[in-house]
């Protein structure tokens, strides 16, 4: 026999409702829980701390081009396997599995269209495809984007989001650093602006090549930008690094970045800057 007897009925709760996956996202910076719709409306930036989430190229296209309308080109280029490279799996298998899993075909997408009524060519990298690494296809597509800009007599914007060179392609990957830099020189010869937008992360061979060669180097807030990662540097020199080292704000303070632009202001600032750069004196 129980010593205590409940006189009043217990609190009744309704059955728990299943919450669809992907409805909420946690901010990596401040930890705030954000509803997907709220995040989309805020261009995938945290309304509390302004942390910029990584976004895919097509979202940049939607943001930058008028009415989100653009024409993509060079979509069918695919990576080869010149070294017959194998780590935990064969390189072609890794590429195939990434395509199957992500629905993406490479770590960069090219498009052209109108930005505030003016022609613009955009080459946008995607960290979601093998860390946004630059292999022979990525280098070729960025080079072709420069060619298309010359053909259209239009500015070129390259959006960097990469961990660096694609080591599975060895020297073929490293060659793309020189290849892209050389092709961008042609833009300068034609007096066409090249704008580099660095997002989180812009590292390794990307920062050591085209990402730092812009007529204007722009960054999103708090983007990680550098060659080797901060942990590698710290372990090598055996010293603590300055606070904020390799973040966009640190680079702006030391003259490596020209401006930091919030994603909400990107299209307007870009259009105004390009209009000034194209004025004939």
From Swiss-Prot:
tRNA processing as a keyword of this entry, yes or no, is no
Cofactors needed by this protein, per the record, are:
Zn(2+)
Gene3D superfamilies from the UniProt entry: 2-enoyl-CoA Hydratase, Chain A, domain 1
Q: Where in the cell is it found?
A: Cytoplasm
Q: Where are the zinc fingers (C4-type)?
A: 27-49
EC id: 2.1.3.15
One cellular component term (GO) for this entry is: acetyl-CoA carboxylase complex
What is the cofactor note? Binds 1 zinc ion per subunit.
Q: Is Metal-binding one of the keywords UniProt gives this record?
A: yes
**Summary of subunit composition and partner proteins:** Acetyl-CoA carboxylase is a heterohexamer composed of biotin carboxyl carrier protein (AccB), biotin carboxylase (AccC) and two subunits each of ACCase subunit alpha (AccA) and ACCase subunit beta (AccD).
* Function field: Component of the acetyl coenzyme A carboxylase (ACC) complex. Biotin carboxylase (BC) catalyzes the carboxylation of biotin on its carrier protein (BCCP) and then the CO(2) group is transferred by the transcarboxylase to acetyl-CoA to form malonyl-CoA.
Protein name, entry field: Acetyl-coenzyme A carboxylase carboxyl transferase subunit beta
């Amino acid at each position: 026999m129980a010593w205590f007897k409940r006189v009043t009925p217990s609190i009744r709760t309704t059955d728990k409702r299943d919450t669809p996956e992907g409805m909420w996202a946690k901010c990596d910076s401040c930890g705030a829980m954000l509803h997907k719709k709220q995040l989309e409306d805020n261009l995938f930036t945290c309304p509390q701390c302004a942390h910029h989430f990584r976004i895919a190229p097509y979202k940049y296209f939607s943001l930058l081009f008028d009415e989100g309308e653009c024409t993509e080109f060079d979509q069918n280029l695919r990576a080869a396997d010149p070294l017959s490279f194998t780590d935990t799996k064969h390189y072609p298998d890794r590429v195939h599995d990434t395509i199957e899993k992500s629905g993406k075909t490479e770590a960069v997408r090219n498009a052209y269209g109108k930005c505030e009524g003016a022609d613009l060519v955009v080459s946008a990298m995607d960290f979601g495809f093998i860390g946004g690494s630059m292999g022979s296809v990525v280098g070729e597509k960025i080079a072709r984007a420069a060619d298309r800009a010359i053909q259209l007599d239009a500015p070129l914007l390259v959006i960097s989001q990469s961990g660096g060179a694609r080591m599975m392609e060895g020297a073929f990957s490293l060659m793309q650093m020189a290849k892209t830099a050389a092709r961008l020189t042609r833009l300068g010869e034609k007096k066409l602006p090249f704008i580099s937008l660095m997002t989180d992360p812009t590292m390794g061979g990307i920062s050591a090549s085209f990402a730092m060669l812009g007529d204007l180097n722009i960054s999103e807030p708090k983007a990680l930008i550098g060659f080797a990662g901060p942990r590698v540097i710290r372990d090598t020199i055996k010293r603590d690094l300055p606070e904020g080292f390799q973040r966009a704000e640190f680079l702006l303070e030391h003259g490596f970045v020209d401006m930091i632009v919030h994603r909400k202001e990107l299209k307007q600032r870009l259009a105004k800057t390009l209009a000034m750069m194209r004025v004939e004196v």
